[in-house]
């Protein structure tokens, strides 16, 4: 039986780059890896409203450069840059290192797989019908120039007693072709019936690779 691998990990060094880019000795590696995870968790928690699909981290000696991709840069930067300065201070206190923040705007959030998955999960939490939420996301992505999209919801859909899996697809989503630009996102909806997992695969055009 065929199993799906993570499209991001599958395409590393072919179509995708690592989200943490630094070198460390065997002794320091676990500590820095844990630090990266703490930075990401802190930022994702703080910037929940800013639509952040991914965060890149680079290191050089005692300096950490954090590149935040966001659909709403105004929320991250804040009035007169107040928010960004607060974030810098918090991360510097957390890591004990100099923090450099780089904010990159996501031009088309409707074709960012992580943001699409989070949006569908949010709608499920607001008790919107799962088929309607998926259909709307699929149509929006195709309208904005995606080559193809597939969205899958798993769990007690519609409050059913037995958990099941349903999906919708439009266009082409060739998961086995390494040269294709496949974006992948995952989110969870916390409903009164339990968790519902939302997965999203989007096949993008070359021009949409940001």
From Swiss-Prot:
Keywords: Ribonucleoprotein, Ribosomal protein, RNA-binding, rRNA-binding. Disulfide bonds: none annotated. The keyword Lipid metabolism does not apply. Gene3D superfamilies: 3.30.300.20, Ribosomal protein S3, C-terminal domain (3.30.1140.32). Residues 39-107 form the KH type-2 domain. The keyword rRNA-binding applies. One of its GO terms (molecular function) is structural constituent of ribosome. Signal peptide: none annotated. InterPro entries: KH_dom, KH_dom-like_a/b, KH_dom_type_2, KH_sf_prok-type, Ribosomal_S3_C_sf, Ribosomal_uS3_bac-typ, Ribosomal_uS3_C, Ribosomal_uS3_CS. One of its GO terms (cellular component) is cytosolic small ribosomal subunit. One of its GO terms (biological process) is translation. SMART domains: KH (SM00322). HAMAP family: Ribosomal_uS3_B (MF_01309_B). Belongs to the universal ribosomal protein uS3 family. Part of the 30S ribosomal subunit. Forms a tight complex with proteins S10 and S14. Binds the lower part of the 30S subunit head. Binds mRNA in the 70S ribosome, positioning it for translation. This is Small ribosomal subunit protein uS3. The lineage of its organism: Bacteria, Pseudomonadati, Verrucomicrobiota, Opitutia, Opitutales.
């Amino acid at each position: 039986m065929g199993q799906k691998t993570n499209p991001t990990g599958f395409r590393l060094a072919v179509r995708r780059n690592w989200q943490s880019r630094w070198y460390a000795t065997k002794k320091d590696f676990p500590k820095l890896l844990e630090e990266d995870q703490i930075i990401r968790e802190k930022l994702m928690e703080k910037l929940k409203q800013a639509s952040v699909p991914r965060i890149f981290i680079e290191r050089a000696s005692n300096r950490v450069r954090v590149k935040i991709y966001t659909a709403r840069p105004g929320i991250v930067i804040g009035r007169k840059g107040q928010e960004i300065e607060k974030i810098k201070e918090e991360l510097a206190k957390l890591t004990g290192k100099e923090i450099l923040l780089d904010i990159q705007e996501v031009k088309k959030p409707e074709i960012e797989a992580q943001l699409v998955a989070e949006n569908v999960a949010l709608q499920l939490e607001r008790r919107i019908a799962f088929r309607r939420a998926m259909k709307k996301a699929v149509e929006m992505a195709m309208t904005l120039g995606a080559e193809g999209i597939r969205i899958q919801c798993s769990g007690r859909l519609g409050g059913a007693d037995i958990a099941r899996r349903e999906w919708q697809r439009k266009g082409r989503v060739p998961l086995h072709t390494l040269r294709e630009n496949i974006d992948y996102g995952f989110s969870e909806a916390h409903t009164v019936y339990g968790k519902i997992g939302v997965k999203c695969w989007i096949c993008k055009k070359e021009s949409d690779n940001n």
